[in-house]
A protein has these predicted regions:
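ATP/NTP-dependent adenylation/nucleotidyl-transfer catalytic domains that generate, transfer
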Residues: 23, 168-170, 227, 236-239, ...
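Enzyme catalytic cores with a strong preference for nitrogen-chemistry domains
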Residues: 1-355, 367, 371-380, 412
Length: 640
């Protein structure tokens, strides 16, 4: 396990009812297959050594002895596997029969875990044969035959988690089938005891509509418990006298379904679980309470995980599904507009002033402004869109700004700031030929000066345009475009800005749609340096790196606390064939360095609405000292 990833597997073997020897052989075969793929935790269905549908054969001594013999065989034949294997069987203890999971590692049974909730309704009549774990007064020791044929004592336990000695985050607890379907599943307490993975051995028969319910149940339980949920279901080979079992195996992590088997097929599913991410989420949520419980430890030799069964979205802020993406875009625009509308109404602002450059961010801010004014049933002429051409402005961006203002029906004002900037440079002794940071920032601050004074003049407020990606990189002029009276894009990363503008372009008609699409095709630029042959010469992504990389870095660093080495590893897998390793490392190092050095700009951000789980507001989700040292992160990034 590296960087907190562990591969787990759920298997549905081809069983023969009451043929323990055959079933053991199938379980061993699948366990070896899963282990060869790198699985460290391999789970089989409920009562898989005998079959779930044995009926009154569970009362037969021959079957109970056969199950224990089969367990001994499984232990012996899997002793060399670097994995934990969980199998189900009936176990008699002091005259009572329990439906248990046997946790097997290195040829030994670490413990038996009994089923708590024994269903006796509809098609289920388990209480005819089994008793609940609640009948136990404490831990019991059970005498069984070990892998070498010698007798050994194994504990029968409840409220227990299993922890790997070499990887402390690799912890799991066990529940069985019906345990999940009740109001207070054992998995709730197991997660609070520290289990990052919940294993469920199940024999859930199939009826119309049940698969969707089961899928949601597993997914939602993993979300509630901030855990991975490994669900192995009985399938082919169980008796079809009255029921059919589909082998519906599922693996979920924190509310997301990672793997699902095909219905009515036996086989194995795999997923790479991010244990560090789960631990980070629990640490972040102070309402996730911990309780005490017992632990059993096991040992596994460390094995490299190739992340073959783990994927990372290339644009984690943007849903891949178009229907969901459109729904999300509508929701985001409504959130932004509602936040702005509320502030406009509270301040009794007569106008709203926005610097409209013809670029992506200011276009989105204008879209939000239009939505907010429409919400308040205000005349759009109260929106003052100001274009402020200077040394780097191109005809394309200026023209698009003018077309946008006209199409949306807002007031357009043009303030050419060249003369004012020239005068300012003369005042401070700045040469116009010195294209330094002063040359660039002087223009940005002059624009903010114009906007602020126009807001005062018209009884309005300045609406900020800067986005989340720019804030993370500090790609904003301090007290220039960094400052406003209300920033509507501060929680929107650049990759999402693009999709929001594209969504608006799809929604509207005619020339406005064409202008929005041209804005989307325009290179991202602050336009603070003179153009070349009338074209934009200063392209942001050439200077600080591709925004799709930076947004990827930003998401996994802030949302889940990934260290640079883990971000790099995920990025290499996700962007293989798009960026080479050296490029990813270069821009990751840039991101880390700039993220730390530019915190001072984020420490005094204007107000603005939160719309996603990753934001950098100093009053909300991200409270970081401006003088924090980046050495630990930067050293790790540079040494990749």
């Amino acid at each position: 396990m590296r960087d907190g990833f562990i591969k787990i597997a759920a298997a549905t073997p081809d069983l023969h009812v009451a043929d323990c020897e055959y079933n053991a052989a199938e379980i061993i075969r699948q366990a070896k297959q899963a282990a060869s793929k790198g699985a460290k935790l391999i789970t089989f269905p409920e009562l898989c050594l005998t079959g779930y549908t044995c009926g009154d054969l569970f009362l037969q001594e021959t079957l109970l002895e056969g199950a224990l013999d089969a367990l001994s065989t499984v232990c012996r034949e899997t002793a060399e596997l670097a994995a934990v294997i969980v199998v189900g069987l009936p176990l008699r203890v002091k005259g009572k029969l329990y439906n248990v999971a046997a946790v097997v590692n290195a040829g030994d049974v670490l413990a038996f875990v009994p089923k708590t909730y024994i269903p006796n309704y509809s098609e289920f009549y388990e209480q005819r044969h089994f008793v609940s774990a609640d009948t136990l007064s404490g831990m019991e020791n059970v005498l069984i035959k070990a892998a070498d044929g010698e007798p050994c004592w194994v504990p029968l336990v409840t409220d227990t988690i299993f922890q790997c000695d070499e990887q402390p985050l690799f912890t799991f607890g066990v529940e069985i089938c019906e345990d999940l379907w009740v109001p207070n599943p054992p998995s709730t307490a197991l997660a609070q005891m520290g289990a990052h993975i919940i294993v469920n051995l199940s024999a859930s028969d199939e009826i119309i509509g049940k698969a969707g319910y089961r899928r949601d149940l597993v997914r939602q339980q993993s979300g509630r418990l901030l855990c991975a949920y490994l669900y192995a279901d009985a399938g082919f080979g169980e008796s079809t006298q009255d029921l059919v079992f589909a082998g519906h195996d599922l693996i979920a992590e924190n509310g997301a379904l990672l793997a699902e088997s095909k219905m009515f097929e036996q086989g194995i599913i795999y997923a790479d679980i991010d244990l560090q991410r789960l631990a980070h989420e629990r640490q972040r949520m102070n309402t996730f309470e911990s309780i005490e419980g017992s632990e059993f430890s096991f040992s596994l030799e460390p094995v490299e995980n190739d992340l073959a069964d783990r994927s990372f979205p290339r644009t984690p802020f943007v849903p891949a599904n178009k229907a969901l993406r459109d729904e999300r875009c509508e929701e985001i625009l409504t959130l932004q507009a509602t936040g702005l509308a509320t502030r406009l109404r509270h301040t009794h602002a007569k106008t709203a002033v926005v610097g409209l450059s013809g670029g992506l961010d200011s276009t989105l801010a204008l879209i939000v402004l239009v939505h907010a004014f429409d919400m308040l049933e205000l005349d759009r002429k109260g929106i003052l869109a100001v274009t402020m051409p200077c040394f780097g402005t191109t005809a394309r961006t200026k023209g698009n700004a003018e077309k946008l203002a006209e199409a949306y029906g807002v007031t357009l004002e043009t303030v050419d700031i060249k003369a004012a900037v020239d005068q300012h440079f003369m005042d401070i002794g700045q040469s116009k030929d010195d294209l330094s940071v002063t040359f660039e920032n002087g223009q940005a601050r002059m624009r903010t000066l114009v906007l602020m004074n126009l807001a005062n003049k018209t009884g309005g407020m300045v609406v900020g345009t800067g986005d989340l990606s720019e804030l993370a990189l500090g790609w904003a002029t301090y007290n220039g475009d960094h400052m406003s009276m209300y920033g509507v894009n501060g929680s929107i990363p650049k990759t999402l800005v693009r999709y929001l503008v594209a969504y608006e372009a799809d929604r509207v008609q005619g020339e406005l749609s064409d202008v929005l699409r041209d804005v989307l095709d325009t290179p991202v630029s602050p336009e603070l340096l003179p153009p070349k042959d009338g074209e934009i010469s200063q392209k942001t992504e050439d200077l600080v790196g591709p925004y799709e990389l930076h947004d990827f870095f930003l998401y996994y660093m802030l949302r889940f606390g990934y260290p640079p080495r883990k971000i790099y590893r995920a990025a290499r897998k996700t962007f293989a064939g798009v960026y080479d390793d050296a490029t990813i490392k270069k821009w990751l190092t840039t991101f880390v360095r700039r993220f730390f050095t530019q915190q001072f700009k984020r420490s005094c951000l204007p107000d603005g609405p939160k719309v996603g789980t990753v934001t950098l507001s100093p009053r909300g989700d991200w409270r970081m000292p401006s003088d924090a040292v980046s050495a630990l992160w930067l050293r790790e990034a540079e040494n990749l």
